[in-house]
Curated annotation (Swiss-Prot):
Organism: Caenorhabditis briggsae
Keyword Plastid found: no
Top-level taxon: Eukaryota
Gene3D superfamilies the UniProt entry points to: ATP-grasp fold, B domain
Role of this protein: Regulates microtubule dynamics in uterine muscle cells.
UniProt lineage: Eukaryota, Metazoa, Ecdysozoa, Nematoda, Chromadorea
Gene, per the UniProt record: ttll-12
InterPro entries hit by this protein: TTL/TTLL_fam, TTLL12
Protein name: Tubulin--tyrosine ligase-like protein 12
Length: 672
């Protein structure tokens, strides 16, 4: 090989290997193909059309077409030239799929042709390929703004009415809906890592649809090619690369395993469920009820917490009582409160307390940490008079999948928590439930949530089983029954009646029995668009919290004004009763999460206190729209207190008074 061919445009093969060998090894690309891949990427050689052909066949009645790819020649998987580039037609984050599809007026039609759902698709030349569409943030924002400017729909008072409120009579909307229904049969995903401003690494999952050639390759459990994504670093651009896994003969159909992913590898017995987007089966008669979670469910992948023994707990109880007696005299702090903190977002707002930061937690009165603490046994022995803002095994409250596991074991769960499945352990039962509801014509809309991401990232509201199954590929998730009848709020800024949820700050001073208080003021997060059942991937209709690009869309309102408007909008609703029901719901959730011994539940600990952000949504009872019930959404560890400290200058003092000094002010907090 000549030197020039191994050093293309100043980009040598050795550099290619340095930058890409980790990806190639992880994707199991045979090393003998790497140099050909390097050459084709460097020269932008897309030569699949020289070796393969897209075939369109009609059935006997010329009504249904079948699109697939076949080989034009005999080919061997050991031939180093038999590796091929496939371009990506569109790329998008899961939560913005519709926004991407609607960002270009020609895109739905072209995607329909790509997916084989356009009646005119077969009339085109067989060699014709669909042009790659370039979308821009500006076009997406313009389209999004146009949708927001449309007048809102009137308030509907029944589930059936709301189900019919989203119309797709417009041919363009109909085309878009058909595309969205088929998207998850053709989309693939890869992960990119990038560095945040604070130096931490963040991962982002990108979904993409391959070009005309790649999208025509059908699924098979016994494939003859493998297709994997590759991020080509010189261009900062992703491609798919295809290589043979076995020899093929001329006219053989080319197939890939679309269900090949880490979940299938980990749970091979689930393959028939994970293949549902391409090979639908009926599981509606199978069990819909998962078995109880195992002990490993609560411990796998998590650092263990080490508990203090009973003797040390009693020592701590006496030590804390004595320390508080010294700290307080006639209700006023007489000496400095020693604080060990790894985050000062809240503590820097302390005003009525004389504090001093210490570098050693062994010398602290209060340990205030955003980093998870694990060794409570050592804490009790080294600093028995200290109080810490965490409970052992509190992940049973603050991690979505564990909270769901705790909630699902409560017989009264339907009164305060939505039906929830863990897609990483209970997918077969969920598929059975979904198909059973589908057969019976029941409400069948679900919200998919990752365990550990916030602000709407990788969340989806959908009635599409294929989408739910595919979302398992990008990390652990739960799926919850979607609240179809939320209490709506009339936004004064845009006139829309929108979804909202409520953020409460809750202080837990003891577990077993529970001693807890709720901060008397709460925060409201509003959706933007008029609520309707339909277009579930419209984030600004179905989500209340996400990363806002346009800050003007954010409605800030104090809770007193919110209550005034709610009671005026719903004259039969009395907020005092709603608030009492909310308090009961929060207490119930904490009690359930602590109802079993650790690690299946939160453990009591003498030195522990905690502050949680609790998210609540209000929904109408199916039996009567006049009956409003609170539903717990999630509980968050160390919630952001920026707005709390801005709105209420004494908030930080209230936190410390309530949690650590046993000074309970009923004008600020209420026991629950």
């Amino acid at each position: 090989m000549s030197p020039s061919s191994s050093d293309r445009l100043g980009y040598p093969f050795s550099t290619f290997l340095d930058q890409h060998s980790a990806q190639l090894n992880a994707s199991a690309v045979p090393p003998e193909l790497w140099h050909s891949l390097y050459r084709k990427l460097s020269d932008q050689t897309f030569d699949a059309g020289d070796h393969f052909q897209i075939i369109c066949e009609m059935d006997e009645n010329d009504e249904k077409k079948t699109l697939f790819v076949r080989a034009l020649e005999d080919m061997h998987n050991n031939d180093e030239e038999n590796i091929f580039l496939i371009d990506h037609f569109i790329s998008f984050p899961a939560e913005s799929a519709r926004k991407c599809v609607e960002s270009n007026e020609k895109l739905p039609e072209r995607l329909a042709a790509l997916f084989g759902i356009d009646d005119d698709d077969c009339s085109s030349d067989g060699d014709e390929t669909v042009e790659k569409i370039e979308t821009s943030c500006e076009k997406e924002e313009e389209e999004h703004a146009r949708r927001l400017s449309e007048p809102g729909l009137p308030r509907h008072e029944s589930v059936d009415a709301r189900l019919s409120s989203y119309s797709v009579d417009d041919p363009k909307k109909t085309m878009t809906e058909r595309v969205m229904r088929n998207l998850w049969k053709f989309a693939q995903t890869y992960t990119v890592s990038y560095q945040l401003e604070n130096g931490e690494m963040e991962k982002k999952h990108v979904w993409y649809v391959m070009d005309d050639f790649g999208s025509r390759i059908r699924h098979s459990g016994c494939p003859n090619v493998r297709i994997v994504p590759l991020m080509f670093l010189p261009q900062n651009c992703a491609y798919s690369i295809m290589f043979l896994t076995k020899p093929v003969k001329i006219d053989d159909e080319i197939t890939m395993d679309w269900a090949a992913n880490v979940i299938t590898a980990k749970n091979p017995e689930w393959r028939q469920y994970l293949e549902m987007p391409w090979a639908e089966k009926d599981f509606s008669s199978e069990s819909m009820v998962p078995g109880p979670p195992t002990l490993e469910y609560f411990t796998s992948g998590r650092n263990p917490d080490f508990l203090a023994d009973e003797k040390d707990k009693k020592t701590c109880e006496s030590a804390i009582f004595s320390a508080l007696s010294v700290l307080k005299k006639q209700g006023k702090i007489k000496i400095f409160l020693q604080i060990f903190a790894d985050d000062t977002q809240l503590t820097e707002h302390l005003k009525s307390r004389q504090i001093e930061y210490v570098d050693d937690w062994k010398a602290a009165d209060v340990i205030w940490m955003i980093k998870h603490f694990h060794d409570y046994s050592n804490l009790a022995q080294e600093n028995p008079c200290a109080q810490i803002n965490q409970f052992p095994f509190e992940s049973c409250i603050t991690v979505k999948d564990l909270l769901a596991a705790c909630a699902m074991r409560d017989p009264s769960k339907n009164d305060w928590y939505q039906l929830t499945y863990n897609l990483n352990t209970q997918l077969p039962e969920f598929v059975a439930r979904f198909q059973n509801r589908q057969k019976n014509g029941e409400h069948n809309v679900w919200i998919v949530k990752p365990w550990n991401l916030a602000r709407g990232m990788e969340m989806a509201v959908t009635d599409d089983l294929n989408q739910i199954i595919r979302m398992v590929e990008t990390g652990p998730k739960i799926v919850c029954e979607y609240i179809a009848r939320p209490l709506l709020f009339p936004r004064p800024d845009n006139g829309n009646k929108v979804k909202f949820d409520l953020r409460y700050i809750v202080f837990v001073n003891a577990i077993g029995p529970v001693t807890a208080y709720v901060y008397n003021r709460f925060w409201i997060r509003f959706a933007i668009n008029q609520f309707q059942l339909g277009a579930y991937d419209d984030l600004e209709t179905h989500f209340t919290v996400f990363n806002y690009l346009d800050k003007e869309k954010v409605l800030q309102m104090k809770c007193e004004k919110f209550v005034e408007i709610i009671e005026k909008t719903y004259p039969k609703l009395k907020w005092t009763q709603i608030q009492a029901d909310i308090n009961s719901t929060i207490r119930k959730a904490i009690e359930v999460a602590a109802s079993e011994p650790s690690p299946r539940g939160v453990a009591p600990n003498t030195q522990s206190r905690a502050m949680y952000g609790v998210d609540i949504m209000l929904q109408e009872s199916p039996e009567s729209p006049d009956v409003i019930k609170p539903t717990l959404l999630e509980i968050n560890f160390m919630p952001d207190t920026t707005r709390a400290c801005q709105y209420y200058p004494d908030f930080a003092d209230t936190v410390f008074d309530t949690m650590f000094l046993d000074e309970i002010d009923p004008t600020k907090v209420t026991p629950i």
